[in-house]
Every structure is written in structure tokens, then in C-alpha cells.
């Protein structure tokens, strides 16, 4: 083998630089997924909010016709009421309906999200742009919820009633 190949092997043979993932109880991650569903026989291309607790791997989901601020707030409110509390820290993507990325790299929360956050008393943490792996637990939960609850597309009469059912699953 050539000099470069030998040096690469030397340099990289014992490369065990990893940070262990340790999650503290009470931290949660939030993300949306896409799913089709039938309400009163009408097909909708909707979205489902996912909240997962990495420490315990428990997750909750709520289905909506949109992926806007109102859906985020309603879904989180439903989940908080169901679990009887609020996580002390929530991890989010940099969704434009809750945060603006400023030129200097800082973030500015939207007024409505700031009020929602203050009302429920949680700390909001935002992932770095293009770093979905920073909240990998909820990314996995998005797939789990889709495979187990939303495929084939569910059929129901009232979305609100189906969301109550989803909280009990």
C-alpha cells in the first residue's frame, strides 16, 4: 500500500469520537408528518403533529388538515391536557410559523408562539438548520405513528373524535 493509504489507516483506525445521547426526563421533541385520511368519505391530504419523549420513548400524535400555527398550538394543547402536564423543554425545527432566523444567525420567536410558550411555561429549543438528526427520536416516532395508526388512510366522521382516539393509543 502507498504512503497515504497507510497513514489514513493509522489515523482513522481508532476513530471513536461519539457523543452519547442522554435525554433528561421531561424533555420532548416536536415534528410534523404527512398523512392522508378520509373524513365523511372525503379524502384529505393532511399532517400529523408528533410529540415524543426521548427518555421514555413515549409519543403522541394529532391529525390535522394543515400544518400551521393553529394546528401546532391545538395539537400541543390536546397532548398537554391528555398527559396532565407540560414538558419543561421542547425541541422544534425552525418552522417559519414559530421562529424567524435573523441574518446574524439569531432567532426571533413569533409573537403568538412567544405567548403560547409563556402561557404553558416551557423552554423552546430549536435545531440547527438542516440538522434533523438533532431530534432523531421524534423523526423515528413520525414513521412509527404513520405505519401503525395512519396506513391505510383512516376513515372517520369527525376529526376531533379521531384525535381523542389517537391520544388513547
Question: What function would you assign to each model-found segment?
Answer:
Residues 106-124:
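Two-metal-ion acidic nuclease core segments, chiefly of the RNase H-like superfamily
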Amino acid at each position: 500500500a502507498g504512503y497515504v493509504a497507510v497513514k489514513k489507516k493509522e489515523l482513522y483506525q481508532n476513530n471513536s469520537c461519539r457523543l452519547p445521547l442522554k435525554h433528561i426526563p421531561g424533555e420532548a421533541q416536536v415534528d410534523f408528518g404527512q398523512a392522508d385520511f378520509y373524513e365523511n368519505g372525503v379524502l384529505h391530504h393532511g399532517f400529523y403533529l408528533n410529540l415524543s419523549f426521548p427518555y421514555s420513548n413515549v409519543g403522541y400524535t394529532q391529525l390535522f388538515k394543515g400544518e400551521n400555527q393553529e394546528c401546532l398550538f391545538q395539537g400541543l394543547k390536546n397532548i398537554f391536557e391528555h398527559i396532565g402536564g407540560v414538558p419543561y423543554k421542547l425541541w422544534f425545527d425552525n418552522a417559519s410559523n414559530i421562529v424567524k432566523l435573523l441574518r446574524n444567525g439569531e432567532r426571533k420567536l413569533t409573537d403568538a408562539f412567544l405567548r403560547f410558550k409563556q402561557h404553558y411555561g416551557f423552554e423552546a429549543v430549536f435545531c440547527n438548520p438542516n440538522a434533523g438528526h438533532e431530534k432523531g427520536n421524534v423523526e423515528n416516532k413520525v414513521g412509527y405513528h404513520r405505519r401503525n395508526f395512519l396506513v391505510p388512510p383512516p376513515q372517520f366522521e369527525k376529526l376531533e373524535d379521531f384525535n381523542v382516539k389517537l391520544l388513547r393509543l
